């Protein structure tokens, strides 16, 4: 699918996040996560957001006509950036068929000592047609990600970063959403 086809398919429609913590979760195995995706597909979703290559690949193979937002959460000691933090994860997510790759789009430092949003520019330089979703926490993050070439902005990290905790305590950050 090209960018316009992806946007046309998801515009105004529901994307279902099919994710489970790795530990002690009955939906953790990829087969179970695919069943969760099946329920969402029956309900009419336009696509899925899934974590880890094995889940992304199995769900995409089961539902090739649905849009797949692939992420890979990698936790590194001493580093707050964990959503698809480096090109290594991007390469794998591309290879297994992610239509959209979501990355941390904050201005926090990744495990390589670079601002997380800088990965967007690197992806776009190597793969200009790759649709990139930036998971942001603040309006400033959104601006930086748009300048870096992000195709989609998601408020995924609002309330989860030092820059956004105070706003989250007040409830939904409608200013950020707008």
Residue ranges, per PLM feature:
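Active-site-adjacent beta->alpha loops and helix N-cap segments on the catalytic face
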Residues: 27-30, 49-69, 80-87, 105-123, ...
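Glycine-rich phosphate-binding active-site loops on the catalytic face of alpha/beta enzymes
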Residues: 19-21, 42-43, 48, 72-76, ...
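Short, surface-exposed connector motifs at secondary-structure boundaries
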Residues: 38-44, 123-129
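N-terminal amphipathic alpha-helix/helix-capping segment at the start of soluble metabolic enzymes
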Residues: 1-27
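Conserved, mostly hydrophobic/aromatic
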Residues: 40, 59, 93, 145, ...
């Amino acid at each position: 699918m090209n960018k316009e086809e992806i946007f046309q398919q998801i515009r105004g429609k529901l994307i279902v996040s099919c994710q489970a913590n790795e530990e002690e979760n009955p939906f953790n195995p990829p087969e179970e996560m695919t069943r969760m995706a099946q329920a969402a597909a029956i309900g009419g979703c336009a696509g899925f957001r899934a974590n880890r290559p094995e889940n992304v690949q199995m769900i995409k193979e089961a539902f090739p006509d649905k849009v797949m937002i692939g992420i890979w959460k990698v936790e590194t000691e001493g580093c707050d950036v964990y959503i698809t933090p480096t090109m290594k994860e991007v390469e794998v997510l591309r290879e297994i068929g992610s239509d959209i790759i979501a990355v941390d789009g904050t201005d926090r430092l990744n495990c390589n000592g670079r601002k997380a949003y800088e990965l967007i520019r690197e992806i776009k330089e190597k793969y200009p047609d790759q649709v990139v979703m930036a998971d942001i926490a603040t309006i400033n993050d959104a601006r930086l990600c748009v300048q870096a070439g992000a195709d989609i902005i998601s408020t995924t990290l609002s309330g989860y970063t030092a820059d956004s905790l105070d706003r989250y305590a007040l409830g939904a950050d409608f200013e950020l959403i707008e």
